[in-house]
């Protein structure tokens, strides 16, 4: 080996970080990270979460490192949808480089740069505060099929679905329902049948239209935790009705907890192999499931969704929930609802935990003439 080539090889072996830093990008990250939206010092921005303990202000970190020759100028978005859209267009390598610089320089130990904060010192918001669209998958776990029916009826319904899975059933959840971890779930005034559903949220990373299931993962950015809060009290009697009113049931303010972070897909793995999700109210575990209970895979749901609409970066698809919801009787033998004062904890392994308290909303102002939110549960006789 010529002396000059040998010397260059030795430098690359001894100083691999310097090699990637020359371009201000990296092919791999020395540590996994999560991304989220945070309020730090009165400013809302995106950050990378390291070790579930530190938040790196990516905008400030990028600005600081660009002052060195190793990091050429490259914009860092402060909005999560912009970050997702640019992630595979070079931004991923820059974030990797920022993380690698912090880890290899041991900057997380002892005195840390100003752009690194402890997670407990910042306010964690919903990672995508206002998604462009949220699609949810109805009854996509076998344990959730007819779970409020008698056992024999439920068994027949499950067998029929296994014999003919059909296609996924998708519906749109109001983007205005989104809240971040720690925010309050508000029970509409007079309503008494509030329910819970923990779900995996798949965050789209690339435009997708007519995507086949085997290619679906290529269009995914990452994964998050969702709770589909549901008002099972029904709609006002009379007038037009086509059955369940999912706008009342699922679309009200605070009915869409999401977060606390998004885990990029390279750090999560295949959800059909690793998904484990639980939901606890107080100290009582109400739901627990893994992907083996799913009817349609995450990839099949993306295929179906992309056959109906064009998916864009930052769109979210809920994978459905398992048995154990409040309206069901298969797990506990009787129905059970959220009440003011309850604390909901929803966890998906490798992503994180959502924590929310439930509070009752005050009565609406007099003279509004509003039937929504209704002041009674319509599936039961009016209470005097």
Predicted regions and their residues:
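Flexible glycine-rich active-site/ligand-binding loops centered on an Asp-His dyad
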Residues: 163-166, 170-173, 216-242, 253, ...
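N-terminal non-catalytic cap/leader segment that marks the start of a structured domain
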Residues: 22-164, 168, 343, 365, ...
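A generic local secondary-structure boundary/capping motif
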Residues: 24-26, 36, 123-126, 158-161, ...
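Positively charged n-region of N-terminal signal peptides that target proteins for export
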Residues: 1-4
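Bacterial N-terminal signal peptides
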Residues: 7-18
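Catalytic-pocket segment enriched in acidic/His residues
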Residues: 23-30, 144, 232-384
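Non-heme Fe(II) oxygenase catalytic core, chiefly the N-lobe of the double-stranded beta-helix
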Residues: 140, 173-234
